[in-house]
Amino acid sequence: MGIVYRANTSADVNITVPRSGTTHRAIVVFPGYIMPGGTLGRAFAPYVADDDALVVVNYAERGVNVSQIYAKVMEALHKLRPVELRVYGASMGGMVAKLFLDQYRQAGAPYGKIILILDSAPVSRNNVKRPAFLFDVSCWCRGGPLSSAVWAAASQFGPKPPTEDDASQEIVREARHAGAWIGMPAATSQGCFIAKFGVLKEGELLDVAQQVVFLQGSSPDDDPLIRISDAISGWRTAFPNLMVITVQGRNARWHLPLVEYPRETVRAMIATRS
C-alpha cells in the first residue's frame, strides 16, 4: 500500500505577529513531528511577550527537507526583522533545529548568535527508548493508508496527560486528533530522520549559540520516550556550558504535553535572558 500512497512533501511555517505590532524577539519553534505547527502556535501565543513573534514549523506529511524548512523560516524572519532570535526544538525538533543552525551559520548568522532551547530532545537514536531495528525499518517502510488507520485507532487508547487550568481544551482536542491522524508516512519519516542524524562534534554550537538550554519535565527518568540524561550528555558535547532547567509543573512521564501545558512551557522557554 505504501508504494502507491502519496503524501505532501512540502513544509511550511505558521507566523504569529507581536501583539505590540513591533518585533523585538522572534522565537522559531521546531515541534516534534506529529505536532501541527499552527495548533502549537495558537497554544503558545497567549503566553509570549507583547513584542515576541512566533515562527512555528509545520512539517511535511513525508520527509524532512531541512533546506526547504530553512528557506521558509528565513523568509518569515526577513518580514519580521527581529532584534533577537531564539530557537526552540522539542523532541525530534531539537535535531531539526541543529541542522537549521548549520545552514544559519553558513549564511553568516544574519541575526547574530542565538539562544537555543532544547526540550526533551534526543541527540541520537540511542537516546530513544525504542528498539533499534525500528529506525532501520522506518527508512524503507514508507507507510500508507492502511497502516495510518491502524496508527489512528491505536492512538485513541491509553491515558492522556492532564492540562493546565487555562489551557484551551479546543486546542488540546485539535492537537490530539491531528496526532492520531498524522499518518504512517510522518511516523516513518520521523524515525528515519532520527536514524540518519549525525554525531555532534565537540564544541560545534559555540560559534552560533550564545546559550543553550535543555528543558526537562519533573522526574525526567520517567520520560517514556527519551533517555534524558544521555541526551543531555550528548548535547553537552556540542555546547559544554549547556544549562538544564526542570519544568516543575510538567511531569516527564507524559514526554512532551506542550498544548496541555503551554504556559509552563513558554515560561521556561523565555526565562533565560540574552
Give residue ranges: language-model regions.
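Short, surface-exposed "cap/lid" segments of acyl-processing enzymes
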Residues: 2-51
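Helix-rich cap/lid subdomain of alpha/beta-hydrolase
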Residues: 129-174
